[in-house]
Design a protein with these regions (language model features):
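Alpha-helical interaction scaffolds
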Residues: 1-157
Length: 157
């Protein structure tokens, strides 16, 4: 929570974004615990509107050379935490923020594909993935909700 108090100083937003980008570049070499911690931190920052999902625009979700197993693990953890830990309104608002920006069309498409391939498909295929049926259903519902939100900036409710 300390980071939230610093974020109110607008001058620190860009250095934080650059710091996150530097960490994203190092994901393939990180230990699993550090990957998990970064995913949880990122989920908290996005959920509290400290950073936008647009911070992910530097990630080439469709490039198989950069999407190593550790990078995929990081973003699977991030999206699983973000989509299950926070309220519908928070999740919807975060995705609507990138839906209203035409320049982020490519990011929206890549996110939808990544979520479908690495989160939803895995939920459907692996009934024994260590998550409850309730959590699985919540993730499926949230995926449908955010996909709809990214496709249009009209109200989903």
């Amino acid at each position: 929570r300390i980071i939230h108090s610093f974020i109110y100083v607008r001058l620190l937003l860009h250095p934080l974004q650059y710091c996150l980008w530097d960490h994203f570049k190092q994901l393939s070499a990180m230990e699993t615990r550090r990957i998990m911690n970064l995913a949880h931190l990122l989920a908290d920052l996005v959920a509290n509107f400290v950073v936008s999902l647009s911070v992910l625009k530097v990630i080439e979700f469709s490039d198989m050379r950069t999407m190593t197993p550790k990078v995929i693990l990081h973003f699977r953890i991030f999206f699983k935490v973000f989509l299950t830990k926070y309220d519908d309104e928070v999740v919807l608002s975060a995705f609507k923020r990138i839906a209203s920006t035409p320049e982020l069309e490519g990011l929206r498409v890549k996110l939808a594909v990544f979520l479908h391939q690495h989160l939803v498909k895995g939920l459907v295929q692996a009934a024994d993935s260590g998550i409850s049926d309730d959590e699985r259903m919540m993730l499926m519902r949230r995926f449908a909700m955010v996909k709809k939100a990214m496709e249009s900036n009209s109200s989903v409710f």
